[in-house]
Swiss-Prot record:
Family: Belongs to the PNP synthase family.
Positions contributing to 1-deoxy-D-xylulose 5-phosphate binding: R46, H51, T111
Residues of the active site: H44, E74, H202
GO molecular function: pyridoxine 5'-phosphate synthase activity
Gene: pdxJ
Record's catalysed reaction(s): 3-amino-2-oxopropyl phosphate + 1-deoxy-D-xylulose 5-phosphate = pyridoxine 5'-phosphate + phosphate + 2 H2O + H(+)
Subcellular location: Cytoplasm
Lineage, highest ranks first: Bacteria, Pseudomonadati, Pseudomonadota, Gammaproteobacteria, Lysobacterales
Name of this protein: Pyridoxine 5'-phosphate synthase
Site entry (Transition state stabilizer), positions: E162
Protein's job: Catalyzes the complicated ring closure reaction between the two acyclic compounds 1-deoxy-D-xylulose-5-phosphate (DXP) and 3-amino-2-oxopropyl phosphate (1-amino-acetone-3-phosphate or AAP) to form pyridoxine 5'-phosphate (PNP) and inorganic phosphate.
Record EC number: 2.6.99.2
Keyword annotations of the record: Cytoplasm, Pyridoxine biosynthesis, Transferase
Length: 256
């Protein structure tokens, strides 16, 4: 099984929006990632439009279809439409991405930092998952590795989960990754047993990706943005994407 790399281009939009105008060009950055071999492009449009905007979503949808790579839209399915943000379901209706990842983040969060609460939100999620699937989208739910109810994602109709890897990255940074890897491996096995595909993302980097993939079975896709864009400032965007692909292929070790 080959793990796919989906590059999250949110941070390109952060840099653009910090100055206004169109530079750096999010579509051109995504095109470079695809040219380097990325299997897909991920975006997480937020209602406050702090980075990716609706017009970026439409343009990136066209680009990914043109190049035959996956488009993954992340977002909070409960966030209502507002000026400049038509809502996650409407964005997916307009662009029909191959995958939508449902993330329970609030408007004020700096970044996604927790997974779905099945007890609280399961009843609301089921009809939304069905609605996304009628659009032809594969549906993935953002989950915490320690959640005992991961199998509930399958019962709600989801196709995959995305394991929130922030805690693993923190543990790896402090040289304490083994207990975290055991937790994530158990989560992956439980998901697989329930018939779910396994994605992973958040704070994965060249420093920790190889160890994660070696320790966690059956990972179909990793979504990486913040670290990849940061590393690209030193290494260049296309070489950085190729470095990640080499790690995924087992052709490179973790970075020093």
């Amino acid at each position: 099984m080959s793990t796919h790399l989906s590059v999250n281009v949110n941070k390109i939009a952060v840099l653009r929006n910090s100055r206004g105008g169109q530079d750096p060009d999010v579509v051109q950055a995504a095109r470079s990632c695809i040219a380097a071999g990325a299997h897909g492009i991920t975006v997480h449009p937020r209602p406050d439009q702090r980075h990716i905007r609706a017009d970026d979503v439409y343009a990136l949808s066209t680009l990914t279809r043109m190049h035959g790579v996956e488009f993954n839209i992340e977002g909070n399915p409960f966030a209502p439409p507002r000026a400049g943000y038509p809502g996650l379901l409407e964005l997916c209706r307009a662009t029909r991405p191959q995958q939508v990842t449902l993330v329970p983040d609030g408007d004020g969060q700096l970044t996604s930092d927790h997974g779905v609460d099945f007890a609280r939100d399961g009843a609301r999620l089921a009809p939304l998952i069905a609605a996304f699937k009628t659009l032809g989208c594969r549906v993935s739910l953002f989950v915490d590795a320690g959640n005992p109810e991961i199998a509930q994602a399958a019962a709600l109709g989801a196709d995959r989960i995305e394991l929130y890897t922030g805690p693993y990255a923190e543990a790896h940074h402090h040289g304490q990754s083994q207990p975290s890897l055991a937790l994530f491996a158990d989560a992956a096995r439980r998901a697989h047993a329930a018939g779910l595909g396994i994605n992973a993302g958040h704070d994965l980097s060249q420093h920790n990706l190889a160890d994660f993939l070696a320790g966690v079975p059956d990972v179909l896709e990793v979504s990486i943005g913040h670290a990849l864009v940061g590393e690209a400032l030193y290494q260049g965007l296309e070489p950085t994407v190729r470095a990640y692909l080499a790690i995924i292929a087992g052709g490179a070790t973790t970075a020093a």
